[in-house]
Amino acid sequence: VTKQTRSLIIIPTYNEAENLEPLVTAILALDADFEILVVDDNSPDGTGEIADRLSRELPGIHVMHRPGKMGLGTAYVEGFRWAIERGYDYVFEMDCDFSHDPGYLPTFPTKITSADLVIGSRYVKGGSTPNWGILRRLISWGGNAFARLMLGLKAHDCTGGFRCYRREMLQQVPWDKIRLQGYGFQIGAVYYVERLGGKVVEFPITFEDRRVGQSKMSSRIVMEAFAYVIRMALSDKKRGDVHTLKSETT
């Protein structure tokens, strides 16, 4: 008897009261057996209360409450641990603001069967960011190019947060070494997946601007990612940059 695979979508939230219920409704409408874990950082706008109500009313909706705003990276790491403890096979990352179209979700399971990490990519052929201004495109594209160049990464969209991990890879990545608040966390995750010999597969997505609410992007998050890439590049150089951690982790 073939064991049914279990998939969990982790959605970190901070002040997403207007977006959360429409997003959950859209995901469940796919009828694809996705479960959802909302990780809420004590949102002042009542997002956590909405999440609790949804978990009572709907099957497969789980909620983790944290005491305050602790950042994207730690939300995902706590969510990953929660998922591993409960035996999920495939674990997704997804923004709550509809910049990640739920319609792409069914594509991930078709790719993850032959990969360790699948990324919905803005920077492979067919991917796009249609509503972005020049400055935002420059920062995002430049940040990706910088990370790929400095760290020798093969993935095109190293900062994108629409992802699916295979559980076995989640268990190998040293998450405690990626203590970052913003999208630098995503760069660190790709770095370790590739260094561990994992297979990364990308497919094109159209990345939309958030529908409602405030963007979480800040200059501090950009600088955090920049500093992280420099630090890891220097670390690679120091140990001879063999582009693999397998010998170190076995």
Region spans (language model):
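A conserved acidic beta->alpha catalytic loop
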Residues: 40-49, 98
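Short beta-strand/loop segment that forms part of the nucleotide-sugar
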Residues: 11, 34-43, 64-65, 94
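Short glycine/serine/threonine-enriched helix-capping/active-site loop
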Residues: 93, 119-121, 203-205
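Hydrophobic helical membrane-anchoring modules
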Residues: 1-7, 145, 150-153, 175-250
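Acceptor/aglycone-binding surface of glycosyltransferases and processive sugar-polymer synthases
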Residues: 62-85, 90, 102-183, 210-225
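Short, acidic, metal-binding catalytic loop of nucleotide-sugar glycosyltransferases
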Residues: 25-34
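N-proximal low-complexity "stem/linker" segments adjacent to membrane-targeting elements
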Residues: 1-26
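Acidic helix N-cap motif at the loop->helix transition within catalytic regions
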Residues: 18-22, 45-54
